[in-house]
Curated annotation (Swiss-Prot):
It comes from the Eukaryota. SUPFAM superfamilies: FYVE/PHD zinc finger, WD40 repeat-like. It is found in: Endosome; Early endosome; Cytoplasm. Zn(2+) 2 binds at C314, C317, C344, C347. The keyword NADP does not apply. Zn(2+) 1 binds at C287, C290, C322, C325. The lineage of its organism: Eukaryota, Metazoa, Chordata, Craniata, Vertebrata. This is WD repeat and FYVE domain-containing protein 2. It comes from Homo sapiens. GO terms for molecular function: zinc ion binding. WD repeats lie at residues 22-61, 66-105, 112-150, 153-192, 197-236, 240-279, 364-399. Its main location: other. It holds the Pfam family WD40. The gene is WDFY2.
Amino acid sequence: MAAEIQPKPLTRKPILLQRMEGSQEVVNMAVIVPKEEGVISVSEDRTVRVWLKRDSGQYWPSVYHAMPSPCSCMSFNPETRRLSIGLDNGTISEFILSEDYNKMTPVKNYQAHQSRVTMILFVLELEWVLSTGQDKQFAWHCSESGQRLGGYRTSAVASGLQFDVETRHVFIGDHSGQVTILKLEQENCTLVTTFRGHTGGVTALCWDPVQRVLFSGSSDHSVIMWDIGGRKGTAIELQGHNDRVQALSYAQHTRQLISCGGDGGIVVWNMDVERQETPEWLDSDSCQKCDQPFFWNFKQMWDSKKIGLRQHHCRKCGKAVCGKCSSKRSSIPLMGFEFEVRVCDSCHEAITDEERAPTATFHDSKHNIVHVHFDATRGWLLTSGTDKVIKLWDMTPVVS
C-alpha cells in the first residue's frame, strides 16, 4: 500500500536570485541600480565594478575600474548617475556613469579626510557631499566646486551617517556608542543633542523621514529605535542577533525594518505594532520578591544568618531578583526580546501567549554580512559578505 506524501508547509523566506563573485577582497559597499538589472560595487581590492545582467542570466562587469587606494565606501545618485567613492587614503573621487552603464567618466577628486573615509552621502537637493573619516572628522563639501563648507570633530570614529533633507539634521553614529545630531547651515553647524543607549559602538544607522524615526545598530548585537518625531524621548530596543549588527534598511511602505549582522542573519522586524520600552533596571540590596540579601549586603546576611545571593534582573518589570525567583525564561517580542530572556516568576505567569507571538522573522544569508542595500520598488535586497561575495535576494515573500 502506497503511503500518502503530506506536502510540507510553505515557509516564507528570501529567494536567492544571484551570486556575484570575482572580488579579491571584501566588497565594502554595493548598490542595486534602480530600473536596471545592475549592481555597482566598491571593494577593498581597489576596484569599482558595474555588474549588468547578461543574456545568460548571469551578472558580469561592464565597467572594471582600478582606484589608487582601497575603496572604503560609496554613494550613488540614480537621477544624476553621480558616483562618489571614498578611499582609504582620505580622498573622495567622483564619477558620472553613462546612460547604458558601460562607461565611467571622472569628474573630480578632493582630499576630504586625513585618513580612511568611512561613510559618504550625496545630497542632491543641496548639492552637498557629506562624509566621515577615521580622522574623527565629519565634513561637508559643495559637490559642484569641491570646496569644503564645514566640519565637526566627533568623539570617536564614525561608522553611521544619515541626513534629513527637510530639517537639515545630520545623524552620526560612532564607535563609542554615541549618536550625534547636528543642524547644518551652508557653512557652519550646531550641536542639537546626543543619544547614548548602546553598550557597544554604533555600526549602522537608518532614518525614516516619514515617521521621523532613527534606527541604530551596534556591536552589542542590538538595534534601538529612537522615536524623534514623537517628542517623548521613546527608545525601543530590538534584540534579534547573535553578533554585531552590520547594516539596517527600512521598508517604508510596509513599515518593516531589515537588520543584518555578522552572524549572517537577516531579520525582518514588523514595526507596525505597538512596542514597549524596556524598563530601567532597579537597584536593591536584597531580592525584591523574597527579600533574600544579595552577596554584598553583609549586615542583612549576618542578621538573618543567610548566605548572600547573586543579583539578576527581570527583563519585563526591571526588578532586582535572585536566581530562585527568576528561574523561568520567556520571549517578550513587544519589548524587542525575540529570544527567551530571564523574567521573574510572577511576570512569567502574567505573559500571555498573544504577548509571546513573534514580531520578527529570521533568515540565514549563509555569509557574514558587512553591507546591505534594499530596493523597495522591486523588493530586492543586496548583501555583501566577508566571503567577498555579493548576493541578490528577492525579499517579497517576507517584506509585504
